[in-house]
Amino acid sequence: MSKPVIAIVGRPNVGKSTIFNRIAGERISIVEDTPGVTRDRIYTASEWLGHEFSLIDTGGIEISDAPFMEQIKQQAEIAIDEADVIIFLVSAREGVTDADERVAQILYRAEKPILLGVNKADNPEQRQDIFDFYSLGFGDPIPVSGAHGQGVGDLLDAAVAKFPTDLEEEDDDSIKFSLIGRPNVGKSSLVNAMLKEDRVIVSQIEGTTRDAIDTKFMAENNQEFTMIDTAGIRKRGKVYENTEKYAVMRALRAIDRSDVVLVVLNAEEGIREQDKKVAGYAHEAGRGIIIVVNKWDTLEKDNHTMKEFEDHIRNQFQYLDYAPIIFVSAKTGVRLQNLPAMIELVSENQNRRIQSALLNDVLMEATTVTPTPAINGKRLRIYYMTQVAVQPPTFVVFVNDINLLHFSYQRFLKNQLRKTFDFTGTPIHLIPRQRK
């Protein structure tokens, strides 16, 4: 099911990022800290009392060279386009300003629920003195303090109560995938080329609230796929469409809904920082990943070119050592016919379940070949392992002391699982648990 989206909007210096971080809390790093992954806190998954949602800080979207009010206007429009619930943030310290009133004018046309949060209400007097904000026309102001956390729960209670009840259920059997990558890597031409590869387009599904178009098609083996619409592929250019952070935000939304993510690189331009950033998000979200090098036809090649390019990718994306790499050309169609089977394989590996008996056979063999380490005379003992989840495959390993299970030995155990059960294209998570 698509998760609801909350966007925080307001003029500069009202504390949007403080509220964003307060709501997001530690969930920004919920999966793991991955070396080589650059985080951008503009967009994160969060949860309140069992309700999962995505959170956008529009203040993190900076439109370069745009006038002050034009930036605010565009940030508000992003919220109107993307969000299910909008938090309009103002400041108790400054009271109602001209800039607040201009933001309000833009938000009046939004056919979305809007909550008025009065930030920096850090003491009882400020929490009481919020009546002027009724003049903005968004109902009861909700006093909050991003610095101290007061009132944030009330704001989230109000937001959750406004979540739409008709978000599209995504429980069909099709494999959902998206193509992500910075502008000019050829996502659009790759989409069009894939849909021309002797497959039948089943339907184009209009998104309920967000202009997205998902395309279903059938592969030759009758496996159904859903191509998730991604930033900039079909949506025509508004001013902010080309800003890097906005593109990243849209890519994250696509990742959120995908089973498998195709990270598209441009063979002509090589690997850029934004490539690594977005790929890192897909990795940390636990999605299946395929690295697709497009425009392969444009390079002059010899017998070593592909191997050298692959080695360069492995060096730059060390945390994606499990992701297969395919070199394609949307223009000539080379190797595009291999993509559906590769997507299907990665999806199967994402959903692979291993019986506990087989896992413990692997564990026994692994600890025999490479005995467990000892720290300060105390040796790690591993009792057993069991799988607790899929998408991605997640395993709990029970030990005598979790402090003895060093990262390097965890990596060794993961490698043994991959060696035995493949898991091509999917991250695997290992959770140590201390047996009492």
Curated annotation (Swiss-Prot):
> Quick check: keyword Lipid metabolism in the entry?
no
InterPro entries per record: G_ENGA (IPR031166), GTP-bd (IPR006073), GTPase_Der (IPR016484), KH_dom-like (IPR032859), KH_dom-like_a/b (IPR015946), P-loop_NTPase (IPR027417), Small_GTP-bd (IPR005225)
Q: Which residues are listed as membrane-spanning?
A: none
Extract the GO molecular function terms from the UniProt entry. GTP binding; ribosome binding
Statement: the UniProt record of this protein carries the keyword Electron transport: no
Q: Which residues are recorded as binding GTP 2?
A: 181-188, 229-233, 294-297
Q: What cystine linkages occur within this chain?
A: none
Which terms under GO biological process does the entry name? ribosome biogenesis
- Domain annotation KH-like: ranges: 352-436
What role is this protein assigned?
GTPase that plays an essential role in the late steps of ribosome biogenesis.
Q: Which family does it belong to?
A: Belongs to the TRAFAC class TrmE-Era-EngA-EngB-Septin-like GTPase superfamily. EngA (Der) GTPase family.
Q: What is this protein called?
A: GTPase Der
- The species this protein belongs to is Latilactobacillus sakei subsp. sakei (strain 23K) (Lactobacillus sakei subsp. sakei)
